[in-house]
From Swiss-Prot:
NCBIfam families: CoxB. The chain crosses the membrane at residues 27-48, 63-82. Cu cation A1 binds at residues 161, 196, 200, 207. Belongs to the cytochrome c oxidase subunit 2 family. It is a multi-pass membrane protein. Component of the cytochrome c oxidase, the last enzyme in the mitochondrial electron transport chain which drives oxidative phosphorylation. The respiratory chain contains 3 multisubunit complexes succinate dehydrogenase (complex II, CII), ubiquinol-cytochrome c oxidoreductase (cytochrome b-c1 complex, complex III, CIII) and cytochrome c oxidase (complex IV, CIV), that cooperate to transfer electrons derived from NADH and succinate to molecular oxygen, creating an electrochemical gradient over the inner membrane that drives transmembrane transport and the ATP synthase. Mg(2+) binds at residue 198. Component of the cytochrome c oxidase (complex IV, CIV), a multisubunit enzyme composed of a catalytic core of 3 subunits and several supernumerary subunits. The complex exists as a monomer or a dimer and forms supercomplexes (SCs) in the inner mitochondrial membrane with ubiquinol-cytochrome c oxidoreductase (cytochrome b-c1 complex, complex III, CIII). This is Cytochrome c oxidase subunit 2. Its cofactor is Cu cation. Residues 1-26, 83-229 are mitochondrial intermembrane. GO terms for molecular function: copper ion binding; cytochrome-c oxidase activity.
Length: 229
């Protein structure tokens, strides 16, 4: 989900997303180098009038084009495996948020507090304010503290959904009868937008997600008002 005139990924708002962007750039660099090398070899092959009689059957060249791709794959696989383990690791979360996907809205529960739960619907275009984002703004945002480890539990009430926020590097499938979890750490304040990323019916495109990241003291005030109300 890119923003206006943006050809790359969104600006990261979590350490894990920063690592994902680094891995993307790392893999892209390797792919560009391979493309340039293969393009150069093909160019030289087409425009070269000489023939190498050992090219089609030579042990040295066969060893090179067998071992070299294996080494290149290792350079891609090792950072990828490291990232996979980092994404699955849960580091003593400060807050647990439960997200339940419905057709076609999200329900949220703050599991550490009593009676803090709400539904989050997309604001229709005809009710949107001038500074709102079409198909992205919701009536009830998720409010979370910055610089805190957050655990999110994701499930669904009807069909398979997917809770996704690109700026945080988070994508968790919500499956009926099953509870999936992941964690993230928001390192700056702001509004972060996401959408359901699993086709879930006619109004799949109208299930946005909005996270409002605030300092811890503001979050405490917000949660106190929510509990008292």
């Amino acid at each position: 989900m890119s923003t206006w005139a943006n050809l790359g990924l969104q600006d990261s708002a979590s350490p894990l997303m920063e690592q994902l962007i680094f891995f993307h750039d790392h893999a892209l660099l390797i792919l560009v180098m391979i493309t340039v090398l293969v393009g150069y070899l093909m160019f030289m092959l087409f425009f070269n009038s000489y023939v190498n009689r050992f090219l089609l059957h030579g042990q040295l060249i066969e060893m090179i084009w067998t071992i070299l791709p294996a080494i290149i794959l290792l350079f891609i696989a090792m950072p990828s495996l490291r990232l996979l383990y980092l994404l699955d690791e849960i580091n003593e979360p400060s807050i647990t948020l439960k997200s339940i996907g419905h057709q076609w809205y999200w329900s949220y529960e703050y599991s550490d507090f009593n009676n803090v739960e709400f539904d989050s619907y997309m604001i229709p275009t005809n009710e949107l304010s001038n500074d709102g984002f079409r198909l992205l703004d919701v009536d009830n945002r998720i409010v979370l503290p910055m610089n805190s480890q957050i655990r999110i539990l994701v499930t669904a009430a009807d069909v398979i959904h997917s809770w996704t926020v690109p700026a945080l590097g988070v994508k968790v499938d919500g499956t009926p009868g099953r509870l999936n979890q992941t964690n993230f750490f928001i390192n700056r304040p702001g509004l972060f937008y996401g959408q359901c990323s699993e086709i879930c019916g006619a109004n799949h495109s109208f299930m946005p997600i909005v996270i409002e990241s605030v300092p811890v003291n503001y979050f405490i005030k917000w949660i106190s008002n929510s509990v008292n109300s």
